[in-house]
Amino acid sequence: AWVNKERDVILEEMKRYEDEPANKVEEIYHSLLYPHTKLGMRIIGEEASLRCVGANELRNYHTQWYAPERMVIMLAGAIGSQSNNITEQVTEWFGALPKKKTRNIDVVTPSQTKPQLAVVTKRDAAQAHLIIGLRAYQRDSEDRFAWGLFNLIMGVSFTSRLFKEIREKRGLCYHVRSGSSAYHDVGSWDIYAGVATDKVEEATKAIIGELVRAKAGGITEDELTVARKRLKTMLAFRSEDPEFWTEWYGRTELFGMPLMTLADYIKKIDAVSVPAINALITKYFKTESLNMSLVWSKPRDEKLLTLLSL
């Protein structure tokens, strides 16, 4: 009974996602990047499969993936002299869990030889939502340090290139931002914008234009200095919160990466140079790696695909 009750709740949640184009455009972008893989599937699932899932399937899934050897328990904050008691308590709660053999994760091997475009037509969409991106680095790549700074330069703040060009200069949108998604063996760097339906072509040209400018001219020493200072400031503020540390060390341990202190991370950031970032731009900015997803009220427009060129 509880499975059916929760199923109805999730079906309503699924409808909410369908009504939010900003979420939908991310879904179709990932399916475009990673077709025919679990990474490219919707996290919430599909209605048909959700209606078929029963208690036995859920139990089997839990058995396959939830095991002590996959578990990381991270504590941070004012623990002090209580650490021994906490360790004992955690052992009491979780130490007796039976060990079991779990499945290995699937390896994703991307294959793309030309730009791709995915479009969903939503007749009642008041705005067009688009993502333009490129394939990039996996989660543990050393490229992540330099690229994090480049991302700040391109699309994270009011002083970023994309904000100044797309919003301030051209007035094409209220919100534009860039960001990375890095997984075990694949990753991407993406730009999102919400624009008027009749401005999609202009916005696409403007975004591609900024990518072309970055590829041709790279970044400047001044931009790197500002980005580095901004990143350090962000880390200083965030590190005051114990939740930051639970995520910092917890995710690192969970993903099997070498533990890195904040001081170690800052050393990596300080070591990033303009030539290093420009080399990564050359490495990742390739026409055949471009992908675009779009949710708007119109049918698919093939002209947009022709604009995807670096």
Task: Write out the residue ranges for each language-model feature.
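His/Glu-based metal-binding/catalytic segments typifying zinc-dependent metallopeptidases
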Residues: 102-161
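M16/MPP (pitrilysin/insulinase) zinc-metallopeptidase core fold and M16-derived inactive scaffolds
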Residues: 153-172, 183
